[in-house]
């Protein structure tokens, strides 16, 4: 295992499972000073274990990459927590960012987010607006959210304001050992972001800094019912406003009975690119 004695701006945490083309696509979109960040890839039991040779076939060798191998497929929550625990042991970064295989960043994403957190010490967690795109049909829609902390806190009762691959948060916000909760299957990020917001403010940069791949085999589609049930549990546990909590749970239960293709059509008609 490498050691990273010098201070860096951020670690970029990416879970990986049998998707080398998607991983390389994502890594090629990252633009930042190579000396100031490290990519941490957690291979969640791929059929062919990921190697540094695989990664460096597609990106510059100047970029620092750490691959953590899990012996078998443990699921995204375990993969993410394994990565976070490794990062915590290093103790040499100001921030942690996320990206998923297949998603891509605007050239200034990380420069903007690092600067934002440096300039706003009360903010623990920053995300951005994003575009969801189906690369097979080229259908796309915008994901637009409130940007200021007070409205974010209210809106979190109804949906996860922070799209996972868009976020960056302070390393120091996890000093109590916070990890992704394993009690909310397919919505671990929702619970994790609520934990971070208990310790500081959240913010959204109102620009499309990430394009997220719509994966019709992914969690959000194939396990939608389980995800919605987990989101209900998150709102019940973390929501602090009784009225908003009730309304948020009502909305999520309504989504349980609406077919996803109807939801997708509505999103496309309202927010289509």
Which positions does each model-derived feature cover?
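N-proximal low-complexity "stem/linker" segments adjacent to membrane-targeting elements
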Residues: 1-29
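Cell-envelope/extracellular polymer assembly enzymes that use nucleotide-activated donors
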Residues: 9-11, 38, 191
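A conserved acidic beta->alpha catalytic loop
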Residues: 43-54, 72, 100
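Conserved donor NDP-sugar-binding/catalytic core segment of glycosyltransferases
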Residues: 108-141
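Conserved nucleotide-sugar donor-binding catalytic segment
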Residues: 146-226, 230
């Amino acid at each position: 295992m490498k050691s990273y004695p010098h201070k860096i701006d951020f670690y970029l945490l990416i879970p990986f499972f049998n998707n080398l083309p998607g991983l390389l696509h994502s890594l090629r979109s990252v633009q930042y000073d190579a000396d100031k960040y490290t990519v941490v890839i957690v291979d969640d039991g791929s059929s062919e274990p990921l190697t540094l040779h695989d990664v460096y076939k597609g990106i510059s060798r100047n970029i620092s990459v750490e691959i953590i191998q899990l012996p078998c497929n443990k699921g995204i929550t375990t993969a993410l927590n394994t990565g976070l625990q490794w990062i915590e042991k290093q103790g040499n970064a100001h921030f942690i960012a996320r990206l998923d295989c297949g998603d891509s960043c605007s050239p200034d994403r990380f420069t903007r987010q690092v600067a934002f957190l440096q300039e706003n010490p009360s903010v623990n967690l920053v995300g951005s607006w994003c575009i969801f795109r189906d690369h097979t049909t080229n259908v796309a829609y915008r994901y637009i959210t409130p940007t200021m902390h007070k409205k974010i806190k209210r809106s979190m009762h109804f949906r996860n304001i922070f799209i996972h691959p868009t976020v960056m948060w302070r390393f120091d916000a996890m000093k109590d050992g916070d990890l992704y909760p394993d009690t909310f299957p397919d919505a671990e990020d929702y619970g994790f972001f609520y934990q971070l917001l208990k310790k500081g403010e959240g913010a959204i940069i109102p620009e499309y800094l990430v394009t997220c791949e719509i994966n019709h085999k992914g969690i959000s589609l194939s396990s939608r019912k389980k995800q919605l049930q987990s989101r209900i549990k998150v709102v019940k546990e973390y929501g602090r406003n009784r009225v908003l909590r009730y309304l948020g749970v009502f909305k999520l239960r309504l989504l349980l009975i609406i077919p996803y293709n109807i939801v997708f059509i509505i999103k496309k008609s309202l927010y289509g690119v």
